[in-house]
């Protein structure tokens, strides 16, 4: 059997994972939240417990371009999910703060992501998951 290129496999799994998340309806003001919006809510919620979160943090965390993050954040601001407030340490920077509406969605989003992650890892041992995570981290470093 011929080996399928790893890049194709990674892209395929990523697409299927996003599609799965899109099939779990989570509406805010009549519009379904995208997987990226959901993950941003989780990351900002969790990281803001211990530190200010800035746009550049999301760029690094998700390995996406500034313009991509800007577009997603602007839409989330428009929809009342987050606001940008001046940083207490550096007034030039704007920290990301979730609104009460986004915080109310956090538990549901967290549950959805945990269920999707469980489905993704179904049939894998803890050792296989740890090994795969190590391999992915190495691949990420290779391509940076």
Could you describe each region identified by the protein language model?
Residues 55, 73-74:
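Short, hydrophobic-biased segments on the C-terminal half of alpha helices
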Residues 1-31, 79:
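N-terminal leader segment of winged-helix/HTH proteins
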Residues 16, 43-47, 135, 142:
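Short amphipathic alpha-helical elements of helix-turn-helix/winged-helix folds
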Residues 22-65:
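N-terminal helix-turn-helix DNA-binding core of bacterial DNA-binding proteins
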Residues 74-133:
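Charged, amphipathic alpha-helical coiled-coil/dimerization segments
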Residues 2, 6, 36-40, 54, ...:
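N-terminal positioning helix adjacent to the helix-turn-helix/winged-helix DNA-binding module
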Residues 1, 127-144:
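C-terminal regulatory/oligomerization modules of transcriptional regulators
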């Amino acid at each position: 059997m011929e080996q399928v290129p790893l890049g194709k496999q990674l892209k395929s799994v990523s697409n299927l994972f996003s599609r799965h998340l899109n099939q779990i309806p989570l509406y805010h003001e009549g519009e379904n939240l995208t997987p990226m919006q959901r993950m941003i809510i989780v990351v900002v919620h969790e990281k803001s417990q211990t530190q200010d979160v800035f746009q550049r943090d999301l760029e690094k965390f998700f390995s996406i371009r500034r313009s991509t993050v800007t577009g997603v954040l602007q839409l989330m601001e428009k929809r009342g999910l987050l606001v940008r407030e001046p940083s207490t340490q550096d007034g030039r920077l704007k920290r990301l703060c979730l609104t009460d509406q986004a915080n109310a969605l956090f538990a549901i989003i967290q549950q959805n992501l945990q269920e999707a992650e469980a489905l993704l890892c179904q049939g894998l041992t803890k050792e296989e998951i740890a090994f795969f995570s190590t391999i992915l981290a190495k691949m990420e470093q290779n391509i940076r």
